[in-house]
Amino acid sequence: YDIIDSKGNKNIHCYANCDGLVLSNGDILAVASCRANSGYRDLPEDAGIELRRSTDNGVTWSEPVKIYQGVNWEPFLLELPTGELHCYFTDSSRTGLEGHDTDTGTAMVVSADGGKTWSPDFSSSPYYVLRMRWEKNGIVGYNHQMPSVVRLNDNKGLAAAVETNNSGYHISLCYSDKDEWEYLAADQEGPADSNNCVFSGMGPYLGQFPSGETVLSYESSSKYTLKIGDATARNFGSAYQPFSGGYWGSLCMIDSHTLVGTNVKVKEGPVQMAQFVLNHRIDAVKREVTVDGNNKEWANTDHALFVGSKSQAQGTLR
């Protein structure tokens, strides 16, 4: 929509990079980066992150509330078991090197009341948490952007997947053994427990199944790519590319064995979407049954094993 920006000029207020999260109380939060369309890099007062809330499964939404002010991209929401909320985002040009290759980093704001209020204060600098130092032609800058963060199972802390633009685009992984990060200065690198530029890729998303397997999605050679990792998100297997091409995919964990992956073909427009099922060992369920043609003994058995292929010889075993 039309605005008069902070420099007194006519401009357009626009949005990008929406992320959503269903809270433990059932509320849905949606956040998006916002900015003035023209000259946004020099208009931090007109940029920020806006949040909307739905309490009726997305039927209606609250008015937008700005929770952060400043130039940013790709906000990402995480809820901890305590109810604390993290909103991570790509922080732009804190060291003033815009135009010299890339100068970003991941920052965050935090809410302790379900997203009603956030800290640091609205117009204050955010918490800097994920940053890699780079140097090129005598110029020093920082990177780690497009964050996706999970709380690892069994209280093993946090794992983050980020994109690093350093002589090409790479996937980097950062870790904390607690449910928090060390807060850094704008010109400080961290965390110490990081595996930078692990392999080529862009735009990562990270998830974990209850059984421990982590899943990483990212873009590689214009294709949506998935890798299965271990319970610590430190070791990943072979790449799997299920879609025909496109950019800027994501993933969402649906249940104990299922995730949904999405990818968009930016030039053509359509969104590609598929459901992926985790294939791993399933413990057989033991039941005492009465042979009477009634399956009531299996009513509470969720695990099913499909046997067969594209033929008439198929069956589902429980």
Model-assigned labels for residue ranges:
Residues Y1-R281:
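Asp-box/BNR beta-propeller blade signature and adjacent active/binding-site loops
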